[in-house]
Amino acid sequence: MGALKPWHIAVLVVVLILLFGAKRLPDAARSLGRSLRIIKAETKSLHDDDRDLAEKANAQAGYQPLPPQVQQEPYPQQTPYQAPPQQQPVVDPVQRARDS
């Protein structure tokens, strides 16, 4: 289930041809390819811009090691939780007389 079988693809192609016509499909595929190429170029330029900004910031500030971390005092030790002692169930004297 969920696997795309060859006959699924064939049915999709037939439906697309019926909906859009054989003449418009190559144009649609071409424009889709152009759009994907543009998106790829834009994402690459965004990554390059981020990398350039990081390099400029490092060059301007110079390499500075991180300041040492301040150790925080540990939480004060708490006594472990102790469950209250279990009590014997209270037996009603009337019930005790019936059980005997």
Curated annotation (Swiss-Prot):
User: How is this protein organized at the quaternary level?
Assistant: The Tat system comprises two distinct complexes: a TatABC complex, containing multiple copies of TatA, TatB and TatC subunits, and a separate TatA complex, containing only TatA subunits. Substrates initially bind to the TatABC complex, which probably triggers association of the separate TatA complex to form the active translocon.
According to its UniProt record, which protein family does this protein belong to?
Belongs to the TatA/E family.
The protein's job, in short, is: Part of the twin-arginine translocation (Tat) system that transports large folded proteins containing a characteristic twin-arginine motif in their signal peptide across membranes. TatA could form the protein-conducting channel of the Tat system.
Membrane spanning segments where?
1-21
- What name has this protein been given in UniProt? Sec-independent protein translocase protein TatA
**Positions with biased composition (Basic and acidic residues):** 44-55
Q: Which cysteines are joined by disulfide bonds?
A: none
HAMAP family in the cross-refs: TatA_E
Q: Which gene encodes it?
A: tatA
Any single GO CC term annotated in Swiss-Prot or TrEMBL for this entry: TAT protein transport complex
Output compositional bias ranges, type Low complexity.
69-81
Naturally occurring in which organism (per UniProt): Salinispora arenicola (strain CNS-205)
